[in-house]
Every structure is written in C-alpha cells, then in structure tokens.
Amino acid sequence: QVLYNRLVSFDPVKNTPIPSLATEWHVSEDGKTWTFTLRQGVKFNSNKFFKPTRDFNADDVLFSVLRQMDPQHPYHKVSQGNYEYFHDVGLDKLIKSVKKVDDYHVQFELNEPNAAFLADWGMDFASILSAEYGEAMLKKGTPENVDNWPVGTGPYALQQYKVDSQIRYIANPH
C-alpha cells in the first residue's frame, strides 16, 4: 500500500470504493461494461534502474491487468507469478476483455455482471505498475527488477532492500 496506488481505494469510515487512480467510472445498463476515467498528472517514482519519461496512463492499467490475466504476457511468469487472488476472486473468468479507449480511459467487458468488480480494483493485487518500466527492464534482460525494485505512484518509493534485514522507504517526491 505504500508503494502503489490502485484504481480505487476505500473510504475509511464507510469501507466503500472511492476514486484513486480512477477519478470516476461508468457501468453500462447491463452491468457488463465498465469504463474508468484515469487521473491525469500522476507521476511514477524512479529508482537506480529507471527514470520515467511519462505520467501514469491507460497503458499502465493494461500492463497490470494483462500481466495477471494473460498467460502469454511477457511478465506473467516473472518472479514465478501465479496471481492467486486475481484467479481466486474469478477475474480471470469474469473479464472478457480490457482495452485502452484513449490515454485516460480504460474499458472492461465482463462475461456477466458482478457486484464485487469495483471493490476488487482496490485490493493489493490490483496495484498499478509502470508499463514503461516493464518494457525498459525487458529490453535490459532484467524483468525481475519490476518486482524486486518496484516503481509505483504511491506515497513512498523503495530506497533500500536487504533480504531478511531491512526495507527503507523515502517519500515519493511527486
């Protein structure tokens, strides 16, 4: 929760979904099409391997969703990912497709209406990763850095990590 944001977060009193990286969402009358409007001007932090050249956008949402959903995605097996929660809540079977409408709109087509769909995007498994970082690390041959040295939009950035010893964060300067 300190490194990443998600499309929605939860109201601390009512425990209902509220805007986070998505500023609003619209649901079709049949409940099977969800369109999210994304917050503009959101910056990813940087690390010793990567400095972002663009703001958060729809490409990052697609990267984060497809990594979990598509077994052919280049990041699906990185760090031995099995995405248990994504599968346990049934998103792999619920989501028919996800597409970028434009830089700040993402649309999900569902196989059937689902009352929990919105709340699922506030869970930790739904953290939004940088597609640009993923692409850069893939080109360098070090895709595991996306998991080992995370880059997010959350309030903090990873400064140092020592296995079984220390994790040090710094405030995200953005």
PLM segments and residue spans:
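Second-shell loop/turn segments in exported
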Residues: 42-52, 94-96, 146, 157
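Envelope-exposed proteins and targeting segments
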Residues: 3, 21, 30-34, 38, ...
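A structural "hinge/loop" feature
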Residues: 1, 21-22, 48-54, 115-127, ...
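Surface-exposed binding/hinge segments that line
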Residues: 37, 62, 69-135, 160-162
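Residue-level signal for nonpolar/aromatic packing positions in well-ordered secondary structure
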Residues: 7, 24-25, 47, 108, ...
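N-terminal lobe/hinge region of extracytoplasmic solute-binding protein
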Residues: 1-29, 66, 151
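Aromatic- and charge-enriched surface segment that lines or borders ligand/interaction sites
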Residues: 23-75, 107
